[in-house]
A protein has these predicted regions:
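Bacterial N-terminal signal peptides
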Residues: 13-24
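Bacterial N-terminal signal peptides that target proteins for export
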Residues: 3-15
Length: 187
């Protein structure tokens, strides 16, 4: 009797594993992150205000007024200046560099905040993918393919609730957990 129960569970376990392996690629495709195309880097340059973000360790001291400013140095280099205000009112900054990825996808960049002499190390570069962008380059979503990082950026310190909701719905369809987004105070 115990032998038949074990055989029954083993058959069903194998059946479930086969079923999961067949459907797993479909689930991955449904939530695959893709960068936008087409994308023109030149109008993307300038100041962006952080509207919301997924929590991350490197912004743990940022309480409000988070901004990013991008300056095109040459086609292969973009200067990145991130700044925010701490809970004590102090402004902190991080100066970095971005570059296009070698894959030819213009909205897929890599960014580093490590010193330039460490730039040869692949580990210091992080993915920076433009995932959503309005035609006027006024509202953007930036993240990475692992869905660990996500930012909503705007050319203005505030956006309408309707714009925010529409964008978060599109991001949710990409597989991002938008319920974890933290809105950023801008004043």
């Amino acid at each position: 009797m115990i032998e038949r129960i074990g055989e029954f569970f083993l058959k069903h376990f194998i059946f479930c594993l086969i079923g999961l392996s067949l459907f797993a690629p479909l689930a991955t495709q449904a939530t695959q992150v893709k960068s936008i195309d087409p994308f023109d880097i030149t109008p993307y340059m300038g100041r962006w205000y952080e509207i919301a973000k997924l929590p991350n360790w490197f912004q743990r001291n940022c309480a409000q007024n988070t901004q990013a400013t991008y300056q095109l140095i040459n086609p292969a280099q973009i200067q990145v200046l991130n700044q925010c205000q701490t809970a004590h009112g102090e402004m902190i900054q991080a100066l970095g560099m971005a570059r296009p990825r070698a894959n030819g996808q213009p909205a897929q960049l890599e960014v580093r905040f490590a010193p330039s002499w460490l730039g040869w190390l692949p580990i210091v570069w992080g993915d920076y993918w433009v995932l959503d962008l309005d035609p006027q380059y006024q509202l953007a979503a930036v993240g990475d393919p692992s869905k660990k990082y996500l930012w909503i950026l705007s050319r203005t310190p505030q956006i309408s609730e309707a714009s925010y909701k529409a964008l978060t719905q599109r991001l949710s369809l990409m597989g991002f957990d938008v319920s974890r987004l933290e809105k950023t105070t801008q004043n």
